[in-house]
Amino acid sequence: MTRIESTFEILKAQNKKALIPYVMAGDPNPSNFVGLLHDLVKHGADMIEVGLPFSDPMADGPTVALAGERALAAGTSTRDALKMVAEFRQQDTQTPIILMGYLNPVEIIGYDNFVALCEQSGVDGILMVDLPPAEAGSFTQHLTEHSMNEIFLLSPTTLPERREQVLTHCGGYIYYVSLKGVTGSATLDTDDVATQVQAIKAETDLPVCVGFGIRDAASAKAIGAHADGIIVGSALVQNFADIDGNDATAVAHAQQKIMAKMTELREALDSLSVSSNG
């Protein structure tokens, strides 16, 4: 059982929903990043998605794309991101880390080398936005052999053939994209998300987590009522926009705002388990 799988087992036994923050590796600066990960855990993260900076992030909305630009400007590479995860693992051996990114940097490193580096660093899951599930066979197998899960996206516009492939190859959890667009865009239709999540759950035993468009306690609670977890990115990383990543005071203030948001989201999700037990 992978760390992701065991975490969901524990959450299920506790009747809790997973809170999964997304942050960009090296944003706002590499020296702060490991501390940021630990703070996220202290403020309720059950697992963390770490973005790998890439120069052409086609699925990222402006907020996350700018986070990637800041990380790249600070000199953060995929190998640097893995070193940060390894440093995090020295003090935290429990919280799953999922890398989210694009294939090009992985292909430069080489698939086998990348998997080996991920295992050495303590990575638990991989989500490559531009890797079609039908073409992921050997990569998925290699990850599985090294106790990691490969995670895929499903969205309202996923075609039936691809949906079937995702449900066949996905591990850890299904990442359901709640909006038809890029990250951080549009507004949530919670009734539609509820219907879609129920349909996915009828086809798989994997947990279903919902991302894109969750920004506050109300949306967290509305989605958490139906999903096994929520993924929140833009609402967190937007706090690093327009600050100087080398200004320690500005960075600390931005992190305080992120942790306040984490507390808000955690309390919203936990209120669901209280109400369902009550």
Swiss-Prot record:
Domain of life of the source: Bacteria
GO molecular function: tryptophan synthase activity
Subunit structure, as described in the record: Tetramer of two alpha and two beta chains.
InterPro entries per the UniProt record, alphabetical: Aldolase_TIM, RibuloseP-bd_barrel, Trp_synthase_alpha_AS, Trp_synthase_suA
Cross-referenced PANTHER family: TRYPTOPHAN SYNTHASE ALPHA CHAIN, CHLOROPLASTIC, TRYPTOPHAN SYNTHASE, ALPHA CHAIN
Active-site residues, record numbering mapped to chain: E49 (proton acceptor), D60 (proton acceptor)
Keywords, alphabetical: Amino-acid biosynthesis, Aromatic amino acid biosynthesis, Lyase, Tryptophan biosynthesis
Enzyme class per UniProt: lyase
Chain's role: The alpha subunit is responsible for the aldol cleavage of indoleglycerol phosphate to indole and glyceraldehyde 3-phosphate.
Catalytic activity: (1S,2R)-1-C-(indol-3-yl)glycerol 3-phosphate + L-serine = D-glyceraldehyde 3-phosphate + L-tryptophan + H2O
Record-stated family: Belongs to the TrpA family.
Organism lineage: Bacteria, Pseudomonadati, Pseudomonadota, Gammaproteobacteria, Moraxellales
Membrane-crossing residue ranges in chain numbering: none
EC number(s) stated in the UniProt entry for this protein: 4.2.1.20
Pathway recorded for this protein: Amino-acid biosynthesis; L-tryptophan biosynthesis; L-tryptophan from chorismate: step 5/5
Keyword Ribosomal protein tagged: no
A Gene Ontology term for the protein's cellular component: cytosol
Coiled-coil ranges from the UniProt annotation: none
Name of the gene encoding the protein in the UniProt record: trpA
Record protein name field: Tryptophan synthase alpha chain
One protein family per Pfam: Trp_syntA
